[in-house]
Amino acid sequence: MSTRAGQDLRDDEVVRVRGLSKTYPAVRGRRGAPGVPEVRATDAVELDVRRGEVFGLLGPNGAGKSTLVRQLTGLLRPDAGQVEILGHDVVRHPERAARILAYLGQESTALDELTVSLAAETTGRLRGLEVRRARAERDAVLEELGLTPLAGRPLKKLSGGQRRLACFATALVGERPLLVLDEPTTGMDPVARRAVWAAVDRRRAERGTTVVLVTHNVIEAETVLDRVAVLDGGRVIACDTPAGLKERVADEVRVELVWREQAPLEVPEVAALRERAAESGRRWTLRLAPEEARAVVATVTGGAAFAALDDFTLATPSLEDVYLALGGAARQGLVKA
């Protein structure tokens, strides 16, 4: 049964979030251990997810992505705000979330003792499928993802990428209209990643399945997302298509310089660049106007600095550049080290 508020959802809306806030209280330190300060994990978050799209939540560690997802899936009650999924108020009725979505979290240890086959079948049974249909869906999903040869192996004995793919398989059994995937391709090789996104695309085309994807892999985000909300400090600081977001920094070029051992700071032009560069070990990253970028490349490749240069790249802006341009607090960027 839909809630009264849910009747106001647009026809193409699957998820509606309004004013969602969650604060973790401060924890006092014990026996000399430092305490933990109060954390505003989500701060008045508002967003909509449309039917059939892959909607991304992008941000660095601590941005509030996983806390937001736990509230979307009914696993964590917010302090304030609304979450409606297909017309259901999952703040007031969190038990309904399991009937309308499949959630793949970062950790899925509950299935570790089961074989790949039994994990998929059991998940289907828990989602209300009768035995014959659960087994049929299990077999189809394992074949689709290339997991049939591993069907009899316990998840705990698989490699990290294989285990992650097996857990993704369980999310597909039962054909939920909404998939909430928290970094689903972590540890996977390129073949497995392609299998994941092919499976997602197939369900979008055939069933109108909607996906909420948590990631801080900007390369993956730019490839698979229809729209993306950029989070920082628990707030949504931007929401648009990847192309729309990158338009905000269209007048910049990213220059990356990698030095062989250390930057030749005795070269005046290099010393001057250091003030504008983000340094990470031997790598310097600069975000410059196109004319400046060309001048920098000419300087380091045509002068005394060239002997110290190991590599350089000149690239158009990425979503990470957008995040930094918007004032994101994690100055080292979005991608996991």
Q: What are these model-predicted stretches?
A:
Residues V173-P177:
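A short, proline-enriched helix->beta-strand linker immediately N-terminal to the Walker B motif
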Residues L179-E183:
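Catalytic Walker B motif of ABC-type/P-loop ATPase nucleotide-binding domains
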Residues T73:
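Helix-to-loop junction immediately C-terminal to a conserved catalytic motif
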Residues R16, L20, E121, R125, ...:
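Conserved ABC ATPase "signature" region
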Residues W197-P290:
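ABC transporter nucleotide-binding domain
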Residues G81-R92, R96-A97:
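Conserved ABC transporter NBD signature motif
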Residues P60-G64:
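Walker A (P-loop) phosphate-binding loop of ABC-type ATPase nucleotide-binding domains
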